[in-house]
Amino acid sequence: MNKLPSNIEILIVSIILIIGCQKKNEINSSFQPIALSIDLPYNFPVIEHPIDNPLTEQGVLLGRHLFWETKLSGDNSISCASCHLPENAFSDPSSLSVGIHGDLGTRNAMVLQNLAWSKDFFWDGSFISLEKQILIPVLDSTEMDETWSNFFTEIKHDNNYRRMFYEAFGTVEPDSIHAVKAIAQFLRTMVSSNSKYDKYLRGEAVLTPEENAGLSSFNSLNGGDCFHCHGGILGTDLSFKNNGLDEIPIDSGRGIVTRETKDNFKFKVPSIRNIEYSAPYMHDGRFNTLDEVIDFYSIGIHPNSPNIDPLIEFASQGGVQLNPKERSELKSFLLTLSDPDFINNTKFSNPF
């Protein structure tokens, strides 16, 4: 004869089930994020971090893992780092990046350095938040072609990720907002500030005569005339300009975003820091070498390019007309902007 379970037996079974569920969801950790600050040289501007996404040790660690995570792509073949390689100052050595389906992107992958001071992202400034910008490559069918929901389904039972998300954000049910915040935190720690030129400014290094001549040319209206757009410690004024690349441009650039005719064919002024490592150059990666870039500004500017920036003061004569010696000197100075400590920093390397 079957005996009905007693109330005590039912209670015991219920407790066992509850404990089993708890163990399944248990995170062997605690939510105690540790604030992280970045040590900056005295001559760098203060970083204003978003109020809703302050730097923490746990958030940066999670972001580093996600930056290198191939599961963020539809076929698990590429990560953010696939198009932003450390040895290339976290840019792509190809003119246009290749997505998981073999499709080419439309613009060159930008360098990831000193993003903590940027207010606009992508070549056309289509996003004013680093967090929002990070959402896009994962979803873009020509790039990673994945959905954030698929990614979180895939890592649902990954105890390492469960622990890291909990330690960073105090949740066992993370979503894309948590992920992009973590990646943004990681990217904001990627500060380049220890080139030879930085050391020179701090009195820790001496420039050679050729490098000094290049620096003078860089800052001279009658020389390279580079300082208008690339002066300052960041190597960019963070503005959008048309530098006269084409007589008849194809890509409308900033104008696509603002829908203002005056912004057509303008692109974000890239930083010249680590320019030695970040070839190819320009928004479409048209120049393969630094020499080609210097030659362009010397003799290759198209003066009739629509909306050419007025700061390109020598456009009417095709450029600043540097002679071979002056070009060599300018290049020597630009190479002092290389920061090997940045590209070799193990804090940015693959954690897997």
Annotate the PLM regions.
Residues 130, 141-146:
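Mobile amphipathic helical/loop "lid" adjacent to a hydrophobic cofactor/ligand pocket
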Residues 26-136, 198-309, 343-352:
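Short glycine/threonine-rich turn/loop motifs
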Residues 91, 140, 158, 193-194, ...:
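Short alpha-helix boundary/capping motifs
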